[in-house]
Design a protein with these regions (language model features):
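N-terminal basic, low-complexity leaders that serve as flexible interaction/assembly modules and, when applicable
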Residues: 1-75, 106-116
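Surface-exposed, active-site-proximal loop segments in enzymatic domains
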Residues: 35-39, 76-93
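A gly/proline- and charged-residue-enriched helix-loop-helix capping module
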Residues: 83-114
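Short, basic interhelical loop/turn and adjoining N-cap
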Residues: 119
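Conserved small/polar residues in nucleotide/adenosyl-binding loops
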Residues: 122
């Protein structure tokens, strides 16, 4: 039997596989928490623990990591009041060193570290 990584990549290439790979994506924070991850260790840990527990229980072939808590770009333009696409032109980059970017990288790295070697085929 192929490793999970081989199974997933063989299926993506269209090669014959012994079974269809199974994966998931799931959000582990509440709707209210989806934009409150910046500088919030509770939401950070909730996302890490949620991914780890789900993967241990379900044992999927691949996982789509969710950077829960970071779904609202930190811009004064981004709001429910945007009424036309032209308004979005004024959104400026926060830069790759911004804590909103850096903390997303940290949460994804922490989630990835919880996976066993066989599941390192995260897609």
């Amino acid at each position: 039997m192929a490793s999970k990584r081989d199974l997933v990549f063989r299926a993506i290439r269209g090669d014959e596989v012994e079974r269809v790979p199974v994966g998931f994506w799931f959000h582990f924070v509440t709707l209210e928490e989806k934009g409150q991850g910046l500088n919030n260790p509770r939401i950070f840990q909730k996302s890490v623990d949620g991914h780890r527990n789900y993967v241990e229980r379900i044992r999927p072939d691949f996982v789509k990591i969710m950077s829960d808590g970071f779904f609202l770009y930190p811009s004064n333009v981004y709001s429910p009041k945007v009424s036309s696409i032209q308004e979005l032109v004024s959104i400026e980059s926060i830069g790759e060193e911004h804590p909103w970017i850096q903390q997303q990288v940290e949460v994804v790295q922490a989630i990835r570290k919880t996976f066993s070697v066989d599941r390192k085929s995260v897609v």
